[in-house]
Amino acid sequence: MEEAELVKGRLQAITDKRKIQEEISQKRLKIEEEKLKHQHLKKKALREKWLLDGIGSGKEHEEMRKQNQQDQHQTQVLEQSILRLEKEIQDLEKAELQISANEEAILKKLKSIEKTTEDIIRSVKVEKEENPEESIEDIYANIPDLPSSYIPSRLRKERNEGPDDEQNRKALYAMEIKVEKDLKTGESVVLSSIPLPSDDFKSTGIKVYEDRQKSVYAVSSNQNTTYNGTDGLAPVEVEDLLRQASERNSKSPTEYHEPVYANPFCRPVTPQRERVISPGPNFQERIMMKTNGLGNHANESAHNMTDGLSERRSNGPTHTSPTRPTPQPRSMVQQVEEMVHTQQKRMASPWEESSNRQNEHEVSPRMELSPSRASPGKSGPQCSSPTCQEETEDVRYNIVHSLPSDVDDTEPVTMIFMGYQQADDNEEEKKLLTGYDGVIHAELVVIDDEAEDNEGQTERPSYHPVAPYNQVYQPPKPTPLPRKRAEVRPYENTNHKSPHKNSISLKEQEERLGSPARHSPLDVPVAGDGTEDPSLTALRIRMAKLGKKVI
């Protein structure tokens, strides 16, 4: 009771102290307001007094004098109110100090009487020891809404505990692991792991490990538990065995293969019969234009494709030419073709043809040389069979096989110039590329540049460095007509003396470019005045304007 009274007195002291503090704060705010009013009235009285000195006697003077007296009286009242409030604040502060002193005294008494946490725990233990007959059931019996079937967890645990508790615990999960131990190295390898129902598991064998979470029993293969060489397992060994068993169970039966890269030139795999195209000059005569850069590129592609197709068409064994190692893309797969001695037509799928074309285009011209054209310095098997001789036929017929099989030979072909490629002009290359002249003939050559479309609309005379040909008049660029051109016979001179473009002699052009002319049996016949084809001359002039060098 004394402790409760002390606590009550302390709470009352705290409440009174709080009220006094609030009252003190209110009085201080009121004092501030009174001081502001007092200052204002004092200034007003001084101003009115100064005005009275300058005004003579009269009614107005009397009114101002009365107002000044009222202001002075109000100022005195405010001064007295301020002094009174300050005195009250001092009294309240003294009362607050007194209450604080009483609160401290009550707190000291309360600390001397109040029990600590340790004392409370100690007293509870003493009470429990004094009343041992009181059980948990008596405590829960006082709860009104508790069902009669409820049994506290502590009481259930006490009832379930017994002398053989460690042996009577039921296994939640069991697994049979067959382990093979190497007696030389001491390593254990898990051969198989079979999960077992926990109900069917019986603690048979010798216990070799137990950590209150899992138990390991060693059983021999013949179910004999008394055998020699059984020792306890270390925790590391048990964890290793469990890890191997779990890895063995979690292995996926999925078989993985090497990465497969898609072929960007793949077509539907519907088999089609290969069209047999007899090599001849019919189609080439229609698409030949003499330009070293474009002819070189087109002839290289045609030569590469012809070698691959001639190997497929040949009846003899396949010959591999000596090549220099060059980096190939990862997606390119080396293909080994096996030729079969047969006279029947071979069926080929379109995707195989496109894949072969891709490989043939990406290989450099030096790698596509046949053994019969290889230089003497390079080592490799020499080929003198008729099959190899067929491969070394005139390259002007090979471009036919590089085109798709669905292209009609009678329709014109549009060839777009994509640019030049730097190439070393050495004599060894010329010898290896015997039979290549870099010439393509065409019925109609249209050279167009979007940047100079406006310039081609106006007619202007062009200047030629050679005096006899400097008065050639250049009309507007001809527009190709959508009509079929007449067939041109082989080696027919297609040069017609017409003032379409400037003409320049071959000798002078070669002197300007600084490279000797390549004479070939397929050169375009030169006109009687020593000039070459106007279309070729226009192409050379156009390339010179663009800053490109015609090789």
From Swiss-Prot:
Position(s), cross-link Glycyl lysine isopeptide (Lys-Gly) (interchain with G-Cter in SUMO2): 125, 178
Residue numbers carrying Phosphothreonine: 270
Keyword Cell cycle: no
Pfam families: Paralemmin (PF03285)
InterPro entries (alphabetical): Paralemmin (IPR004965)
Biased composition (Basic and acidic residues): 247-258, 354-365
Keywords for the protein's UniProt record, in alphabetical order: Acetylation, Cell projection, Coiled coil, Cytoplasm, Isopeptide bond, Phosphoprotein, Synapse, Ubl conjugation
Record's compositionally biased regions (Polar residues): 341-353
Tissues/organs with expression: Ubiquitous. Expressed at highest levels in the heart and lung.
Coiled coil: 12-106
One GO CC term on file: membrane
Swiss-Prot/TrEMBL GO biological process terms: regulation of cell shape
Residues recorded with modification Phosphoserine: 135, 321, 349, 370, 375, 384-385, 498, 515, 520
Positions where N-acetylmethionine occurs in the chain: 1
Renumbered residue ranges of the record's region Disordered: 247-266, 294-390, 451-533
Residue(s) of cross-link: Glycyl lysine isopeptide (Lys-Gly) (interchain with G-Cter in SUMO1): 178
Post-translational modification: Phosphorylated.
Localization, UniProt: Cytoplasm; Cell projection, Dendrite; Cell projection, Dendritic spine
Assembly mode: Interacts with GLUL.
UniProt record similarity statement: Belongs to the paralemmin family.
Name of protein: Palmdelphin
Species annotation: Mus musculus
